[in-house]
Curated annotation (Swiss-Prot):
UniProt record similarity statement: Belongs to the class-II aminoacyl-tRNA synthetase family. EpmA subfamily.
Domain of life where this protein originates: Bacteria
Pfam families xref list: tRNA-synt_2
Catalytic activity as recorded in UniProt: D-beta-lysine + L-lysyl-[protein] + ATP = N(6)-((3R)-3,6-diaminohexanoyl)-L-lysyl-[protein] + AMP + diphosphate + H(+)
Residues reported in the UniProt entry to bind substrate: S74, P75, E76, Y116, E249
GO CC list: cytosol
PROSITE patterns membership: AA_TRNA_LIGASE_II (PS50862)
Name listed for the protein in its UniProt record: Elongation factor P--(R)-beta-lysine ligase
Organism: Vibrio campbellii (strain ATCC BAA-1116)
């Protein structure tokens, strides 16, 4: 029986990958940020309607009827529990799992770098991330723009004040009428316009930080106290690829629980199953999360760009089709 057993990345690319990951660890060691290790599975998971999880079942002593477990889409919830327990600034390089796309820039199992800095807001974290990107990508300093500015400059529409009909007109100009016209959820429509219309136009020469996302897309970020229309959230793009997603972290347990419950209500409206809420995280927030900012970065995509490759299979040994 013939089989494709060889890695898709060359040995030289894998050596360069290892060197870059070593450099990332050194970056955090120099800043006295502690590396941590948290579970790949959990009894609860994310409620975000746009994230899809893998799940399995444990059957063993004390669990004769089985216990459902979810593979983590991010180590965020566990890392925040460490922060609340007094860990100080922390980072992690881990495997994350998302039951979504597989292709040029996606693999269901991928390597993620996530870190949290106590006493930072999202702007100060962008400063630090810019330093890391310049180190790994050998690029210039990043450009920065608000979410509102990016939409107005690229698409000519305001994402905060434009009507659904105005957004759909822009979608039609992008050839997206079939998808956009029946869409009733504003944030889904905005994400479509961002991914197809905005992301390909920004961050071509240097990375682009986009910040102040709509408050309805806050997820686990604080609402901006100076402008409650927006959240203290940012994303990073380079050469048409989303690299990272960061927050000035929400520390209000009641507000976080309400957001999880709102997500699950929206899931039911969409015909999706509600997800089990992580009450361990809520308990950590009740105990007290220190004021901090955090970000999750896709390591495979970062290395792909650093090495001048155009497919993540070129920088991962055994991608999904041959795993």
């Amino acid at each position: 029986m013939q089989t494709t057993w060889q890695p898709t990345a060359s040995m030289e690319q894998l050596r360069q990958r290892a060197a870059l990951i070593t450099a990332i660890r050194q970056f955090f060691a120099e800043r006295q940020v502690m590396e941590v290790d948290t579970p790949a599975m959990s009894h609860a998971t994310v409620t975000d309607i746009h994230l899809h999880t893998f799940q399995t079942e444990f059957v063993g002593p004390g669990y004769a009827d089985g216990s459902k477990l979810f593979f983590m889409t991010s180590p965020e919830f566990h890392m925040k529990r460490l922060l609340a327990a007094g860990s100080g600034c922390i980072y992690q390089i881990n495997k994350a799992f998302r039951n979504e796309e597989n292709g040029r820039h996606h693999n269901p199992e991928f390597t993620m770098l996530e870190w949290y800095r106590i006493g930072f807001d999202h702007h100060k974290l962008m400063d630090e991330m810019d330093d890391l990107l310049q180190l790994v990508l050998k690029c210039g300093a990043a450009e920065r723009m608000t979410y509102q500015q990016a939409f107005i400059d690229v698409l000519g529409v305001c994402p905060l004040e434009g009507s659904m009909q105005e957004l759909k007109v822009v979608a039609a100009k992008l050839g997206l009428s079939d998808i956009a016209e029946p869409e009733e959820d504003r944030d889904t429509l905005l994400q479509l316009l961002s991914s197809i219309g905005v992301e390909a136009k920004i961050g071509q020469q240097v990375p682009a930080f986009v910040y102040d996302f709509p408050a309805s897309q806050a997820a686990l970020a604080k609402i901006n106290p100076q402008d409650i229309r927006v959240a203290d959230r940012f994303e990073v793009y380079f050469k048409g690829i989303e690299l990272a997603n960061g927050f000035h972290e929400l520390d209000n347990p009641k507000e976080q629980l309400a957001r999880f419950e709102q997500d699950n209500a929206k899931r039911l409206d969409m015909g999706l199953k509600p997800q089990p809420i992580d009450y361990h995280l809520i308990g950590a927030l009740e105990a007290g999360l220190p004021d901090c900012a955090g970000v999750a970065l896709g390591v495979d995509r970062l290395i792909m760009l650093a090495l001048g490759c155009d497919h993540i299979d070129q920088v991962t040994a055994f991608p999904f089709p041959i795993a």
